[in-house]
Amino acid sequence: MPTSESRKVFLTGASSGIGLEIAKLLGGHGFDVWGTSRDPARLQQVPHVHPVSLDLAQSDSIRVNFAAALREAGAFDVLINNAGHGAFGALGSMPADVLREQFQVLVEGPAELMRLALPSMRDRGRGTIINVTSLAAQFPIPFMAPYSAAKSALSVLTQALRIELGVPSIRIVEVRPGDIHTPFHEQTRKVDGNARGADHERMKSVWETQMRNMAAAPSPACVAQAVLRAVNSRNPPPVLVVGGVFQARVAPLASRLSSVRLQEYVLRRYYQL
């Protein structure tokens, strides 16, 4: 059971990839973590983690299971919106339900959790909300338009909340990873599987580029460390870009100094389109 002294965290997507790394690191630093998964049995053996069954695609699941976790914890010092998965396919032929599902999981679900967590943070006069977005919010990934757009929406939502909240002791932070070596693509829903000809070749090029980049990318430990720093800081930066040197430092700086046309040209070359 959690002690009264330990800080309590509600973390979505805790059973794999970045979320699992965050759960392990925070648990190892004395936090008690309520970690969500659609398969909570995967978290049974992770120290200091209380498994929570939660499906971000279902509003009732969010409300009921967060409320149960809040009753158990008493209060949450930190909310980390991390869970998510992608959808890969051409936007022009992507089914509408795929677009809706991406925004439900990546935008509406996190927004609902923020609404649920904020009242107790306001009552206590303190708290931290961390939203894990993606560098795709700034540099959209071809054939992952719904994912890129949803992450961009979550980024803007985070900034808007920070501006309108006006409570300095409740910190609102965006953690924006670039490519990270995780099983993310194993969980990506591939649509347009019957694409042929030029479309098929373009999609194949982007997918293979992404797979190469992910294989050579930093481990999720760098994201977990950024989250730990943000949680422990009294005045964390509003946005933390995390990843390899080029993606985390060079690309964001270059984007501020270049035109949209040039950025799109570079992205096409990057993905060999």
Question: Model-derived features: where do they sit?
Answer:
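Substrate-binding pocket helix/loop in short-chain dehydrogenase/reductase
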Residues: 90-91, 98-103
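Rossmann-fold cofactor-recognition segment
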Residues: 47-60
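Residue(s) in the substrate-gating loop at a strand-loop-helix junction
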Residues: 134
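A short, exposed helix-loop element centered on a Lys and neighboring polar residues
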Residues: 114-115, 159
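Active-site helix of classical SDR
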Residues: 114, 150-153
